[in-house]
Amino acid sequence: MKSYFCVTPSGWQETQTRPRIVPKHSEKCSRTYSRPRSSLSDSEGRCVVLPRDGGGRKRKSNGSQGRCSNNPGRPSRKWTEKTIAASRQGFFSKRDNGYWVPKSPEKKYVPKVFPRNMDNKKSFKDVLTSPAKIQIKPTPESILLAQKIQNSTFKSRGKVTLSQFSLPLINRFQEIQLTTHLEPVEESTPFGVNDQRAQHLFCKKVPRKIGRNTVLVCPITGTESHIDAKRGISARIVDSMASVVHTENLPAYERGHVVTKNVSRTKRVCTPVPIIGTFSDRAIRVECDDHTDELASASSVPSIWKPSKKQHAVPISSSNEMGSAVGTKPDWYTPVKTCTHRQYQKVQRVFLDAMNIMRTLRFHTGPQELRETWVKCWLQVHKKNVAFPGWMITPLLSGTVPCEQEFFLPKAGETRGFATVCYA
C-alpha cells in the first residue's frame, strides 16, 4: 500500500491509503450485462464490463485513471507502478469486452562473470590493442578495387591514371560525355533509383497500338521499345567495346546522337549512346535446369574461370517428355521449361556482376583479351543451360561475333528458340 499526502482546500493534510486494485474474475461477473450509467464504480470490487458502445470510458472516483492504454505484455497501473496480479497464463482485460492479455514471462537478468574468458575469446583489452582486420564484402567492385590497390593483378597498358583526360577512350561517345558532363568513366557507376540503364530490368513493356502497328511501350517512362512485336530485334555492334545499336537507330548513331521515340512521336531527344544499351525484356528461353546456383559468383569472377563439373556439353534436345531420344526435330524445337523467378534473379545477378567487371576492366586490358574474357564468362553460363532473357543474350551475341545480329523472339505462348543470323 502506498500512502501519499494531498492538500485539501481547508489546508489540513490527510493521509489516504489507496486500495490496491485487483481484478477479481469470478463466476458472478458475466461478460454480457451492462449496468445503468449511475453505478459505474462498483462497490463490491467486482469487474464491470461495459459494452463497446457504452459511451465514453469508465472513470474511477479513485485517483487511478486505469492502466495506460496499450501495454498488453506487462500491464501495470499508471501511478502506483504495481503490476496487476495476473495468473501465469494471462488474463482477460477489463477494457474492450475483455480481450485476452497473454503474459510474457520476464527473463531474469543474470550478469555474466566478467574476468572469465570462455573459449579463448578476445577480451575488450585484446580487441582494443590489436590492429583491426578489415573485412570487405566481395562485391565485384570491391574485389577489383582491392586488386587495383595491390597493383599485382592487372597488366595495365602503361600507367593507370584516374585523371579523366588521359583515359584511353574506346567508345566514340565517351568523348562527348567527358567534355559535356564530366562523369567519372573509369569506375562503374552504381545504379540509381530510376536509372535509365536499368529500364529494361524494372519496366515490363506493354503492347500498345500506335496507328496500325503494335509497339511495346514502357508504362512508366512511356518509352517505346526498339522491338517490333512481329519482327524481333535487329542490332549491330558498333565499336571495340561491343556497344549495341539497334538497326533503326543506326543513321542517328552515325550522325552522333540517338533518337528516343516517344509515344506521341512529336519530341526527338538527342543523347549520346549510354555505356550500357537497353535490351529487350522479353525472355529468350533456353531450357532451364536447376544448376543456376553453380554459376560464377562475384568471389570467383574474374580471377579464375572454373570449368563446370560435367565436362561434356549436354545437347538440349537429347530426350523428350517420354524419355526416348529424339533426333528428327531441329534442336531449337525443344519444349521449354521456364525458369522460376529465383533462378532468373540468380542469372541476372551473375550477368550484372560480369557486366560491371567487364566495364571496369576495359581500361586495363586490350580489346582482344577483354572479348576473350567476356566469351569465357558466357560459355560458362551457357554450360549451365539456363534461361536467358533477351537483354542478356543481346550483348552476348553482339559482343562475341562482331557482325550484324538478328534475334527472333518467340511470340506470346510460343515455345521456340532463337536464331542467330550472321553475315560474315
UniProtKB/Swiss-Prot annotation:
Name of protein: Satellite RNA 48 kDa protein
Source superkingdom: Viruses
InterPro entries: SatRNA_48
Region of interest (Disordered), ranges: 15-78
Family matches, as Pfam families: SatRNA_48
Family recorded in the similarity comment: Belongs to the nepovirus satellite RNA 48 kDa protein family.
Biased segments, Polar residues type: 31-42, 62-73
